[in-house]
């Protein structure tokens, strides 16, 4: 398939640049992958889409304030976007400036902190913090929330809360697992009251999630790598859920990719998983774990819309997106959501 097959025209006014006043105030488009049937709902109606005994799997990564500003010793301004924390002092990062910093050069950050450029790894720079503080402490002090480029505004204080799930736990993401942004504590309690079980995986979303696919044929695309973990207790809950005949519902494409990465690593029987994953899911993929998913509306020609097309059918997703645009759903990270059931293999 061609990347252009996943293109669509989106009016600029449908890009959500701010979240709704309340997390659950978004709209929800339900898509049945088998029939293609679409239903316009409110996000709170998700309670009617799930059943007693279903298992909802969330990504509990925490977004770090990964964007920092500073200057080189020469005085040239630069912007750093952390891609991955290597340890308490070292990071892999994207560096934007007029001329790339050289190995062993010093970068002066806002707040008086300094980093040394240790090495370059393709498009990424390995930087080491020169401070008694940890990199996380420095990010919390002078870092900015790494809003996606299409939001096209400076980050604000409110983004520290709203570009973060309420159940976040493990710091490391530089982009939010956005399907989870719609859930508040009251909604999680309501799911529990209905008898829906919950479980948590971790996938530290990288900045690569926003990188365009730069090839014509999707088979030529090299997926970026991210760290993921599926604990043993989640594996056990999945087995119990499947045995009962209930569904595994992944909240977000990152939860889907975590679970399917675990299945790929142990194809005979699902096992706990921890490590890097570069799984690329596109039409033709046979899902091993996930039966339904909650997801936001994705960028045209992105690997995420390819994943959704693999899950619910290419034509079905294309039709759903045309419907969403006609009905003026809000798109991307701060936008509305979908509840999607899998198309039978």
Swiss-Prot record:
User: GO: which molecular function terms?
Assistant: S-adenosylmethionine:tRNA ribosyltransferase-isomerase activity
Quote the InterPro entries the UniProt record gives.
QueA, QueA_dom1, QueA_dom2, QueA_sf
Q: What is its EC number?
A: 2.4.99.17
**Gene Ontology CC entries for this record:** cytoplasm
Q: Membrane spanning segments where?
A: none
- Catalytic activity entry: 7-aminomethyl-7-carbaguanosine(34) in tRNA + S-adenosyl-L-methionine = epoxyqueuosine(34) in tRNA + adenine + L-methionine + 2 H(+)
Q: Which pathway does the database say it acts in?
A: tRNA modification; tRNA-queuosine biosynthesis
- Known SUPFAM superfamilies for this protein? QueA-like
List locations, semicolon-separated: Cytoplasm
How would you classify this enzyme at the top EC level? transferase
Pfam families named in the record: Queuosine_synth
Q: Which GO terms describe its biological process?
A: queuosine biosynthetic process; tRNA wobble guanine modification
Coiled-coil annotation reads none
Task: Kindly state which keywords UniProt assigns to this record, in alphabetical order.
Answer: Cytoplasm, Queuosine biosynthesis, S-adenosyl-L-methionine, Transferase
**Quaternary structure and partners:** Monomer.
Task of the protein: Transfers and isomerizes the ribose moiety from AdoMet to the 7-aminomethyl group of 7-deazaguanine (preQ1-tRNA) to give epoxyqueuosine (oQ-tRNA).
Q: Which family does it belong to?
A: Belongs to the QueA family.
> PANTHER family, alphabetically?
S-ADENOSYLMETHIONINE:TRNA RIBOSYLTRANSFERASE-ISOMERASE (PTHR30307:SF0)
Which HAMAP family is this protein grouped with? QueA
- The name of this protein is S-adenosylmethionine:tRNA ribosyltransferase-isomerase
Q: From what organism does this protein derive? A: Shewanella halifaxensis (strain HAW-EB4)
Q: Source taxonomy lineage? A: Bacteria, Pseudomonadati, Pseudomonadota, Gammaproteobacteria, Alteromonadales
């Amino acid at each position: 398939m061609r990347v252009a097959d996943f293109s669509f025209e989106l009016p600029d006014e449908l890009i959500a640049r701010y979240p709704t006043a309340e997390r659950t105030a978004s709209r929800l488009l339900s898509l049945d992958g088998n029939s293609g049937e679409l239903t316009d709902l409110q996000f709170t109606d998700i309670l009617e889409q799930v059943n007693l005994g279903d298992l909802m799997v969330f990504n509990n990564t925490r977004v770090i304030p990964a964007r920092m500003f500073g200057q080189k010793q020469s005085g040239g301004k630069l912007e750093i976007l952390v891609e991955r924390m290597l340890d308490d002092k070292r990071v892999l990062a994207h560096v934007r400036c007029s001329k790339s910093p050289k190995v062993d050069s010093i970068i002066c950050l806002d707040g008086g902190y300094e980093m040394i450029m240790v090495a370059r790894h393709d498009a990424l720079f390995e930087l080491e913090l020169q401070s008694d503080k940890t990199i996380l402490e420095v990010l919390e002090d002078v870092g900015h929330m790494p809003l996606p480029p299409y939001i096209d505004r400076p980050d604000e204080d409110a983004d520290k809360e709203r570009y973060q799930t309420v159940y976040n736990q493990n710091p490391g993401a530089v982009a939010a697992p956005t399907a989870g942004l719609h859930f508040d504590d009251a909604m999680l309690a309501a799911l529990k009251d209905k008898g829906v079980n919950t479980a948590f995986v971790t996938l530290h979303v990288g900045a690569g999630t926003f990188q365009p696919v730069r090839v014509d044929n999707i088979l030529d695309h090299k997926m970026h790598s991210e760290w993921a973990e599926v604990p043993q207790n989640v594996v056990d809950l999945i087995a119990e859920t499947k045995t009962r005949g209930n569904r595994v519902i992944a909240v977000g494409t990152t939860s889907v990719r975590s679970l399917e990465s675990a299945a790929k690593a142990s194809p005979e029987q699902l096992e706990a998983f921890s490590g890097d994953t570069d799984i690329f899911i596109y039409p033709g993929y046979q899902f091993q774990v996930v039966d339904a998913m909650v997801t936001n509306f994705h960028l045209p020609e992105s690997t995420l819309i390819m994943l959704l097309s693999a899950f619910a059918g290419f034509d079905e997703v294309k039709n759903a997106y045309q419907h969403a645009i006609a009905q003026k759903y809000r798109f991307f990270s701060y936008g509305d959501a979908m509840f999607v059931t899998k198309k039978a293999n």
